[in-house]
């Protein structure tokens, strides 16, 4: 199966995809949040190009598992996404994926705008890699 990973954010959303066999994840793009409609037009356009079988959306929580405002925003986004597509949506618990991705990219020498342009994509890659490591029977549909 091919998955499209999403690191949803209020300002920017990182997108990554797996290969057709669902074994490796690759960064694709960052979608800037201008308006909700424009955002979904761009996201669904990527779905037409990439042809994924399902979405994997990072679900941020505090280290103790408590939900936050950001968690609720992601859940609301997923509900809007499910109204626009018939593809299944999986949640992948994530803690600090964006911070870890930023650290890795800084270590690789990226700074400023170059870093900002790809950090959300790299966070989406991390979300997909974590998801792919989970046995299928333990994956959680949204």
Swiss-Prot record:
Transmembrane segments: none
EC class of the enzyme, as a word: hydrolase
Keyword terms, alphabetized: Cytoplasm, Hydrolase, Nuclease, Ribosome biogenesis
Main location: cytoplasm
A GO biological-process term: rRNA 5'-end processing
GO molecular function: nuclease activity
Presence of keyword Thylakoid: no
GO CC entries: cytosol
Lineage top rank: taxon: Bacteria
Keyword tRNA processing included in the entry's annotation: no
InterPro entries: RNaseH-like_sf, YqgF, YqgF/RNaseH-like_dom, YqgF/RNaseH-like_dom_sf
EC number annotated for this UniProt entry: 3.1.-.-
Entry's localization field: Cytoplasm
Protein role: Could be a nuclease involved in processing of the 5'-end of pre-16S rRNA.
Listed HAMAP family: Nuclease_YqgF (MF_00651)
Family membership: Belongs to the YqgF nuclease family.
Name of the protein described by the UniProt record: Putative pre-16S rRNA nuclease
Protein's organism: Nitratidesulfovibrio vulgaris (strain ATCC 29579 / DSM 644 / CCUG 34227 / NCIMB 8303 / VKM B-1760 / Hildenborough)
């Amino acid at each position: 199966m091919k998955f499209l990973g999403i690191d949803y954010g209020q300002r920017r959303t990182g997108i990554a995809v797996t290969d057709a066999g669902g074994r490796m994840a690759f960064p694709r793009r960052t979608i800037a949040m201008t308006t909700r409609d424009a955002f979904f037009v761009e996201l669904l356009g990527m779905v037409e190009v990439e042809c994924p079988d399902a979405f994997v959306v990072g679900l941020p929580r505090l280290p103790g598992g408590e939900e936050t405002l950001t968690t609720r925003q992601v859940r609301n986004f997923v509900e809007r996404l499910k109204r626009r597509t018939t593809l299944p949506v999986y949640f992948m618990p994530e803690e600090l994926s964006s911070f870890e991705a930023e650290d890795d990219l800084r270590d690789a020498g990226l700074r400023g705008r170059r870093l900002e342009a790809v950090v959300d994509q790299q966070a989406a890659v991390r979300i997909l890699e974590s998801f792919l490591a989970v046995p299928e029977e333990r994956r959680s549909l949204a």
